[in-house]
Amino acid sequence: SSTPGAPGRGRGTPARSRYLLAVLLVVAVIAASLAWVVSSPVGSSPDEDFHVGSMWCPPPVDETGCQISTKDGEKAVMVPQSLAKEYVTCYAFDHDNSAQCALNASDEELAPTLRWDDGNYPWGYYQFAHLFVQHSTNRAVLALRAFNALLAIGLLGAIIALADSGLRRAISVALTVAWLPMGFYFIAGMNPSSWAMTGTFAFAAALLASTRSEGRRRVGLVACALAGAVLACTSRGDSAFFLFVITVALAFAVPLSRRIVPEACLACVASAAGIWVMSRTNVAASHLASGSNVSGESWWHIMYLNVSALPDYLRGFVGYLFGPGWNDVSYQGTVSSGASLVVVALLAWSLRSLSWRRVL
């Protein structure tokens, strides 16, 4: 009686091993992400003084209860002193000064800041981030960072779990290679780029995977794609536009048939919404850090700015001319070269199955 049961136990062992491995992998990813969350102080990412100011006083500031003031003759909002630019960035570009200088500011006292969102970003992210506002500015920012990291893990993990085995491996490899090192740095931050990157990747991966799935898996993947589109459209104008770019790419990657009508409808609606969102923002992605305002420009010009910024944007993922902090921490050398080598090796390996459809 024990003999017939032995094969069953043998067949179950690989499944249990895979399940245990998946659980350990998820735990490791969560632990690594939370380590990124607490590894840097408030104000440590590009324009974070702008983002924390917008988090405390989301637009429209006249209706959110924020105190309005003036600074240097310009309209300003009142935020905790610890979030004012002179304190939250006191260590930026100063390699001889640690972030301890930020502790000299108080969470109790208020200070005016000119760094707040006045139409530069779509509605959604800052309004949601405002829900994390509390007495301690450090805890508020860390809580938002942790949420953004767990959101990415949950959404992208669901897509990987629902995708077919072949695509599951491809998505996992692409995600890891493309986002190391800079991608994970932003995902585990409070910058709207966290939602933008999670959303655009989720939209592309889930939509592609859904065209190759059936039943509940397909429904789940379409739902993940929709969630990604919402994140992209509520975080940045450029990520909203990239939904259109992704749709065009998928049109070449997936053969057109009646079967993919639901995915095609979602892609078209998301693309139209993304273009509309981008046209209503005041600042193109490549110009926020430099302070170049393109308010009043046509949406065609804004579209051109976003597309022309793509090469530098992609090179930045491997740390080329781009690093943590306010881009004042260099990844040039081992990190950038190593990441570039991995990307080139992966591209060379992928050429084995290249087709004209994929080239287009």
Regions of interest found by a model, annotated:
Residues 143-166:
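Transmembrane-helix motifs of polytopic, lipid-linked glycan transferases
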Residues 164-167, 254-264, 346-360:
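Membrane-interface helix-loop-helix junctions at transmembrane boundaries of multi-pass membrane enzymes
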Residues 209-214, 219, 223, 240-272:
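Perimembrane helix-loop-helix junctions
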Residues 188-196:
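Short acidic/glycine- and proline-prone juxtamembrane loop motifs at membrane-interface regions
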Residues 60-138:
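Interfacial juxtamembrane loops and adjacent helix segments
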Residues 197-213, 228:
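Specific aromatic-rich, kink-prone transmembrane helix
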Residues 280-353:
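Membrane-lumen/periplasm interface segments of multi-pass, membrane-embedded glycan/lipid transferases
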Residues 1-35, 263-269:
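Start-transfer (signal-anchor) and selected internal transmembrane alpha helices
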